[in-house]
């Protein structure tokens, strides 16, 4: 599993320990949990699910936390520590909305035209000059015009930039499970990225190499030169949405990816879009819409968002 998945599981296990055993001592609490009989474990898991409901947790959140516990117990079961399974003891929550409806809840509008207009507002909200503005606009463009995940933007290193003969960049994208794909940027995003890198050099800010390489997007103040964190990317996108006047609950970094997928699916074959987005399951891509006419997904979206401006 990816590092982010492992961290998410650790947070969910910690929540379980704090909620049930009132402690942050993971080792002690989880050992106690694994010592329970099958009946006791079932009662404990049911109690945890009920407390999450009372807390107001969404079905998807409850299911994710139960999934973390299931993975942990399955590992213990393989080692002969327990002989019961979470799956047999507690049921997950039923999703109240279908997957397509969940995507719609994270979109800024209900029509393709409205979504394109919202993305234009976000991209137009950035000042033309300034290193921070260039950095942040480039980040938003990669998510909105190319459908990159937040973690994919964070992991971009200079070695992932491919300068094509026609002057545009292609990017080597490291997605879930350390799988990579190569996508071609549109001219406008390439221009933004080149301007940002040039401005970074003029400001004499040296990106600091880490385990992933030399980062593309770095902090400009505290921890200057270090790779931006996922939290920092959240803050950048939230600020951009607020400046554009469209920020509300449910809109986030991933909303920009949903916008890209929804717009691209109006004119791009699902298999092409799945490859561009890095979906291992084509059914996930199919949630966005039905497709026609084979074109570059990024070209389709940039035409809707940029050329109509």
Model-found features: residue ranges?
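Conserved catalytic core of the tyrosine transesterase superfamily
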Residues: 1-309
């Amino acid at each position: 599993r990816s590092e982010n998945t492992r961290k998410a599981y650790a947070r969910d296990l910690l929540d379980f320990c704090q909620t049930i055993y009132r402690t942050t001592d993971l080792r002690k609490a989880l050992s106690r949990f694994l010592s329970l009989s099958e009946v006791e474990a079932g009662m404990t898991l049911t109690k945890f699910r009920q407390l999450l409901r009372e807390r107001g947790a969404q079905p998807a959140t409850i299911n994710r936390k139960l999934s973390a516990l299931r993975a942990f117990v399955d590992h213990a079961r393989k080692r002969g520590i327990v002989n019961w399974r979470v799956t047999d003891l507690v049921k997950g929550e039923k999703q109240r909305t279908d997957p397509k409806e969940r995507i719609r809840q994270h979109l800024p509008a209900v029509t393709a035209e409205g979504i394109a207009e919202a993305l234009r507002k976000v991209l137009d909200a950035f000042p033309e000059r300034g290193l921070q503005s260039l950095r942040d606009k480039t980040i938003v463009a990669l998510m909105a015009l190319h459908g990159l995940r937040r973690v994919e933007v964070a992991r971009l290193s200079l070695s992932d930039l491919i300068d094509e003969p026609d002057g545009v960049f292609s990017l080597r994208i490291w997605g879930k499970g350390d799988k990579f794909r190569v996508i071609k940027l549109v001219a406008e995003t390439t221009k933004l990225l080149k301007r940002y890198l040039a401005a970074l050099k003029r400001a004499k800010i040296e990106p600091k190499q880490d385990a992933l390489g030399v980062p593309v997007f770095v902090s400009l103040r505290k921890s200057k030169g270090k790779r931006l964190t996922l939290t920092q990317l959240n803050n950048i996108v939230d600020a951009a949405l607020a400046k554009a006047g469209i920020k509300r609950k449910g809109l986030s970094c991933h909303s920009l990816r949903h916008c890209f997928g929804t717009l691209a699916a109006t004119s791009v074959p699902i298999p092409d879009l799945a490859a561009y987005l890095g979906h291992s399951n084509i059914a996930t891509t199919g949630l966005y819409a039905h497709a026609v006419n084979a074109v570059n997904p990024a070209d389709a979206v940039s035409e809707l968002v940029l050329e109509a401006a």
